[in-house]
Amino acid sequence: MKKLIIAIATCMIFGMADAQDRRQMGGIYHAYPYASMADNLIDATPEGYTPFYLSHYGRHGSRWMTNDERYEWLYSYFVDRQNLTPLGRKVGKAMRKVLDNARGNGGRLSRLGAIQHEGIARRMYSRLPQIFAPGNRVKARASVVDRCVKSMQAFTAMMQSLQPALEMDIAADSANMAWIAYTAPEVKELEKSLNIVARTNPER
């Protein structure tokens, strides 16, 4: 009996691990959770040293798919109910809810994306509170893209809630795009020589 219980428990553990692995196989479509184990990788400040400056360059948080058309395209496969199995009809019904919920949000920052940037601010403050002492200055710059601006706002709002006496210098200006979305001269030369434009697939 004991062997049977151990065998069942082992199967359950591997089953849960397998489910987690399959979710993570979503690649760019999987919002990887923050792993608290990473906290153990942060070294303490060496004796005799005092942190005085922190620089962070980050990407926007989790977003909705790039545009509403992506959701409509997915749902289009479930419109013809006559060609669906019972499971297909059930999935189609769920997809309709997803489509209705997503409409108008294509490419925008999701609530999870905002939470991710709030978490970054919270961890910065808890690990290096002396850098964020009253009167110190936080300078934040973002791309003019809406999801990037919203990510910055989530970060800075959390930081200010943790330390209201901080001086906040916040901006999203097209004048900063040259360094925020920098393209190396080598890439530009390569584009010219190959007569192609190196870019990310817009269908991601």
Feature roles, as predicted:
Residues 20-204:
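Non-catalytic terminal regions with compositionally biased, polar/charged low complexity
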Residues 4-15:
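Sec-dependent N-terminal signal peptides
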